[in-house]
């Protein structure tokens, strides 16, 4: 008889955020990637090493609810909670994408108490590159 392999841990009941808690990070970069379907918030140090991340999907939202501003707000709060505990005081914000969670994530970051040195929009804009997808007919 083959014994079933027990699951050690899963993302659902495991940790949220960073595994290393001993590092002190006074300054960092917060990347917000807001698409129409999801919002991903990644917090890195100034060298670009990921400290913490969260998305609307890992915050408990499924399906079409992941693209909402409220889901983006809770993803930003989850990502920032761990780095505030590690001592982050100043940050730069890079926002990418056209999604509805852009402003909500930025509002949640401002409310967290971290001083923002600047907010930069790094949405990639084509200089008439690839042909866009056809218009939807509903």
UniProtKB/Swiss-Prot annotation:
Protein localization: Plastid, Chloroplast
Keyword match Chloroplast: yes
Pfam families: Ribosomal_S11
Matches recorded under InterPro entries: Ribosomal_uS11, Ribosomal_uS11_bac-type, Ribosomal_uS11_CS, Ribosomal_uS11_sf
A GO cellular-component term linked to this record: chloroplast
Keywords on record: Chloroplast, Plastid, Ribonucleoprotein, Ribosomal protein, RNA-binding, rRNA-binding
SUPFAM superfamilies the UniProt entry points to: Translational machinery components
Spans annotated as Disordered: 1-24
Any one Gene Ontology molecular-function term assigned to this protein's record: rRNA binding
Basic residues bias (residue ranges): 9-24
Gene Ontology BP terms: translation
Gene3D superfamilies assigned: Ribosomal protein S11 (3.30.420.80)
Quaternary structure and partners: Part of the 30S ribosomal subunit.
Recorded family membership: Belongs to the universal ribosomal protein uS11 family.
HAMAP family xref list: Ribosomal_uS11
Protein name (database record): Small ribosomal subunit protein uS11c
Gene source species: Lemna minor (Common duckweed)
Lineage: Eukaryota, Viridiplantae, Streptophyta, Embryophyta, Tracheophyta
Gene from which this protein is expressed: rps11
């Amino acid at each position: 008889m083959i014994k079933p392999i027990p699951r050690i841990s899963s993302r659902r009941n495991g940790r949220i955020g960073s595994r290393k808690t001993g590092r002190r990070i006074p300054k960092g970069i917060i990347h917000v990637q807001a698409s129409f379907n999801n919002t991903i918030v990644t917090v890195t140090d100034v060298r670009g090493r990921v400290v913490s991340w969260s998305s609307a999907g890992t915050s408990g939202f499924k399906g079409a609810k992941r693209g909402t501003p409220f889901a983006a707000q809770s993803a930003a709060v989850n990502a920032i909670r761990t780095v505030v505990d590690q001592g982050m005081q100043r940050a730069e914000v890079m926002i990418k994408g056209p999604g509805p969670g852009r402003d909500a994530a930025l509002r949640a970051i401002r409310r967290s108490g971290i001083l923002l040195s600047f907010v930069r929009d790094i949405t990639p804009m084509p200089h008439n590159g690839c042909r866009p997808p056809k218009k939807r007919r509903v």
